[in-house]
Amino acid sequence: MSSFLVSSNNLPEREIPGDYGFPIISAIKDRYDYFYKQGEDVWFHSKAEKYNSTVVKINMAPGPFTSNDYKLVAFLDANSFVYMFDNSLIDKTDTLGGTFKPGKEYYGGYRPVAFVDTSDPNHAALKNYILTSFAKRHNLFIPLFRNSVSDHLFQNLEKQVSDQGKSDFNALLPNMTFGFIFRLLCDQTNPSDTVLGAQGPEHLRKWLFPQLIPSLSARKLPSFIEDLLFHNFLIPFGLVKSDYNKLVDAFSKNAGSMLDEAEKLGIKREEAVHNILFLVGINMFAGLNAFFPHLIRFVGEAGPTLHARLAKEIRTAIKEEGGAVTLSAINKMSLVESIVYETLRLRPPVPLQYGKAKKDFMVQSHDASYMIKKGQFLVGYQPMASRDPKIFDKPDDFIPDRFMGEGVKMLKHVLWSNGRETENPAPDNKQCAGKDLVHLLGRLMLVEFFLRYDTFTVEITPLFRAPNVAIKTLTKAT
């Protein structure tokens, strides 16, 4: 039995409930409900409520006509969801994006490691390469990120709040995150000094758009137009080829040490470049730009009482380190740490995990056992798993100190990284290679905020997944 799973021999076996409905028509109706009428959260909850089960058959968006394989079984509670982490049961080959997959031309003819199952010998080599590359650069994480938020975020926040009465936090993130990532992986080269100029984030967003939009709603067009354009057909790579080629050129010329490291591990430089770009685009750029708005939203909405606690904890820890922002100081900040975990629990950057059954197996929810047949396409919806009321008290509430003190025992139920928070990424698993980096950067974001400000207020505009956060006021540190 996998260490991920908690099983019981006393649960009754049930047939998997649910109904795929009429071919194509029912799937399109489900797609409209998922994207436009209900939204992702309500849609998944409605399926569980309708069939009184957290293991249920669904038509998974986007469905027709981007994919012919959209009849899935969904795992919607903490107990069933963790089966998605068991590499002996779940095949992750080409399932990262769900029921559709972008062509290999998006990645230079290669399949990045995220699309490769652990049973493929290439997986361990590529995952080890990424892990060792991060390890060799760990001393750069704090200084490079601090420089990036200082240069690209806070100066602009303050100016916009002063001049315009508010600042669009989300709009300022791409330049900051891209600059940090590029300097981290490209020997501290400033992206504006390369062929990319100031357009690096824009090239990256254009390349990412056709890969992500089939599973999202931009909410910028009438629903029927958006659905027709983006959920029925995959966008041809040719439309973004020039953007991708500029990114390849920039990283090929400036990520010299990372490419040298790849060659020493037996990985071709060309393959390494395309894996680096996937890491940069999907794992880091898209992930951080989804995570940070939720973090600032939750903290901003919590108000001045929490802000005072954070400011005191952060400034005290920094003072004890002689005024330096060090990893040692950050590790003393238990409230900051808990808030980052709580944000990742409530709003994981990647909410859906996909895979196909490698063999017949029994999956258990809290209430029953279900037979999964070999080849069945599966999806786990993480926000329901990590807000499972049978695991967490007040599961939908943002509780800043949830993971302080005895609360650290609940970290095994924080699942955002494609693994338990108590587990670590390794060459033989699919857990996010940047797990520890994301957590560090979340803490650093709060440290930088509350070294500068005593409190702030926010205005929130809901979007399909990440909210748009406007900073309304900033009260400088006293």
Swiss-Prot record:
**Catalytic activity annotated for this protein?**
(9S)-hydroperoxy-(10E,12Z)-octadecadienoate = colneleate + H2O; (9S)-hydroperoxy-(10E,12Z,15Z)-octadecatrienoate = colnelenate + H2O
Q: What Enzyme Commission number(s) does the record list for this chain?
A: 4.2.1.121
Please tell me where this protein is predominantly located.
cytoplasm
Question: What tissues express this gene product?
Answer: Not detected in leaves, stems or roots of healthy plants.
| Keyword line | Cytoplasm, Heme, Iron, Lyase, Metal-binding
What Gene Ontology molecular-function terms does this entry list?
Answer: colneleate synthase activity; heme binding; iron ion binding; monooxygenase activity; oxidoreductase activity, acting on paired donors, with incorporation or reduction of molecular oxygen
Which branch of life, at top level?
Eukaryota
Whether Lyase counts among this entry's keywords is: yes
Query: Where, per UniProt, does this protein localize?
Result: Cytoplasm, Cytosol
The record's Gene Ontology cellular component field reads: cytosol
Induction: what does the entry report? Up-regulated 2 hours after addition of elicitor, with a peak after 4 hours. In roots inoculated with zoospores of P.parasitica (Ppm race 0), detected 1 day-post-inoculation. Up-regulated by ethylene and methyl jasmonate. Not induced systemically. Not induced by salicylic acid or by wounding.
Keyword Plastid among record annotations:
no
Residues that, per the record, bind heme: 432
This chain's function reads: Strictly inducible cytochrome P450 involved in the biosynthesis of the anti-fungal toxins colneleate and colnelenate. Can use (9S)-hydroperoxy-(10E,12Z)-octadecadienoate (9-HPOD) and (9S)-hydroperoxy-(10E,12Z,15Z)-octadecatrienoate (9-HPOT) as substrates, but has a very low activity with the corresponding 13-hydroperoxides (13-HPOD and 13-POT).
PANTHER family noted in UniProt: 9-DIVINYL ETHER SYNTHASE, CYTOCHROME P450 26
UniProt similarity note: Belongs to the cytochrome P450 family. 9-divinyl ether synthase subfamily.
Task: Supply the name of the protein.
Answer: Divinyl ether synthase CYP74D3
Q: Which gene encodes it?
A: DES1
